[in-house]
Amino acid sequence: VVGVLLAAAFGLSYGVQQAVAAQFHEVAFALPFLSLSLGHLVLAGTQQNPQRASHITHACWWAAPLAFVKEDMGVTAAMIGAIALIRSGWLREAANTLFPHASKDVPAFWPRLREVFSGWTKSRGAAEATLLMVWGLFWSYTSMNLILPIFNVNHQFDYADKVDLFGALKNPLNALQLLFTPDEKAQSLWLLLMVGAFLWVVSPLAAVALPTIAWRMLSSNSSYWLSTWHYSLVLMPIVFMALLDVLVRVHEHRRRVAASAHDKAAADQNTAYQKPEQQNTAGSDWAKPYRNATQAIILKTPLWLVPLLALVFTVAPILTAQPTQPLAQLTDPVFTTTDQTSTEVNKRRAVDAVPIGASVATDLSIITELIPG
């Protein structure tokens, strides 16, 4: 049930709708790579080695081709590598080795550093994740600074001035404000949060969406701020895989709680028989009621309810009085007619008037009609 609801919510999500309604874009090739890579990261979070390392390695291999989909997707691949490195567990082991607890027999720093490097080379998954980070950043940089300028008549990357990356780094507070203003940005971010029932941001996998969100919201091109066209397509598998990761983690938590229920009951019974002076009389824990309430929600809320909410939030923009999503056009009588409007007739005449082999300037509405073949 959970899988069916998640699949329905993903298929009806605004990012998929808008991309299907718009003209085909190369970002569509990113979806299978993102889905398979993030899917392996979800599985890695539920396994121990060697199964975990195997899933992390597969996640890195599936993410590597993202660098060839579009110039910014290399940064997304690098972010997947960072999440894979964290999920591999190697960083925790490296930190414990470099900064051990106080002990009489702590080796010198350089031997500890060599041990960390040796562990990195031998740890399956950690090396692949690190190399994926380097791979993604390398190809994004090379694409924007070498490959694309070669094919440009002015030998430059035409979109370089759309995002002031160095300005954002010099003034991060202003960049943070620009992420949410003007209102079109806040509305797009709100819709992105809502389509994943808000809970998807709890997963570490949600960080994979940050590069795409950053370049869109920091861009000077106002069309990037909106939830239309194909711009949100690559975010949809990230949102729903992150939501799946949250649900899987909740399921695993419930399983662990059920497995230890007998031990907890025995401990509670033992505490009940203690004398009053033996019981813990420390100061009251003001946060305990909130923790208990959160624990009760996690343990008792049906898992299928979360993807159901995601599906409801996904369908809601289609069914409003003033729908904003393409599927709402199915109820428009104009959608079912074959009669062309005067604008469409004029566009067809303009296309027919262009000689074969001629070069013309056009907008996006008829560009595909002018492509040979």
Describe the function of each predicted region.
Residues 76-134:
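Perimembrane helix-loop-helix junctions
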Residues 90, 121-200, 205-211, 310-320:
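Membrane-lumen/periplasm interface segments of specific transmembrane helices
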Residues 344, 350-373:
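Short periplasmic/luminal acceptor-recognition loop of GT-C membrane glycosyltransferases, typified by
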Residues 3-31, 40, 63-64, 68, ...:
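Aromatic- and kink-enriched transmembrane "portal" helix at the membrane-lumen/periplasm boundary
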